[in-house]
Amino acid sequence: MRAPEEVIIRPIITEKTNRLMEDLNKYVFEVHKDANKHEIKHAVEKLFGVKVKAVNTLYARPRVKRTITRRGRVYGATRGYKKAIITLDKNSKIDFMSL
């Protein structure tokens, strides 16, 4: 089993995830690509001291980007990563500003 600091890479904070945090008490994290739901749940409970109700995971695939420059078309790609959507117990809350 990995250390909790290795499992949770960073929180993903966007307008959509802020709405999820406020309305449904769900938090979104980028996690290690080989981490399973049990490791993710254990890591969140240990790092933030909260009670996790559910864990949903998904893989955000890499996207191809292209741009046209003086040298012609240039192709690149974003990296793929694994996301975890954590649903907390209704009495639990994570405050990212105090970290």
From Swiss-Prot:
rRNA-binding in keyword set: yes
Keywords for this protein: Ribonucleoprotein, Ribosomal protein, RNA-binding, rRNA-binding
GO BP: translation
Domain of life the protein comes from: Bacteria
Molecular function via GO: rRNA binding; structural constituent of ribosome
InterPro entries: Nucleotide-bd_a/b_plait_sf, Ribosomal_uL23-like, Ribosomal_uL23/eL15/eS24_sf
Gene Ontology cellular component list: ribonucleoprotein complex; ribosome
Pfam families: Ribosomal_L23
Keyword field contains Ribonucleoprotein: yes
Biological role stated in the UniProt entry: One of the early assembly proteins it binds 23S rRNA. One of the proteins that surrounds the polypeptide exit tunnel on the outside of the ribosome. Forms the main docking site for trigger factor binding to the ribosome.
Classification via HAMAP family: Ribosomal_uL23_B
PANTHER family given in the database record: 60S RIBOSOMAL PROTEIN L23A (PTHR11620)
Subunit: Part of the 50S ribosomal subunit. Contacts protein L29, and trigger factor when it is bound to the ribosome.
Family indicated by similarity: Belongs to the universal ribosomal protein uL23 family.
Protein name per UniProt: Large ribosomal subunit protein uL23
Organism this protein belongs to: Hydrogenobaculum sp. (strain Y04AAS1)
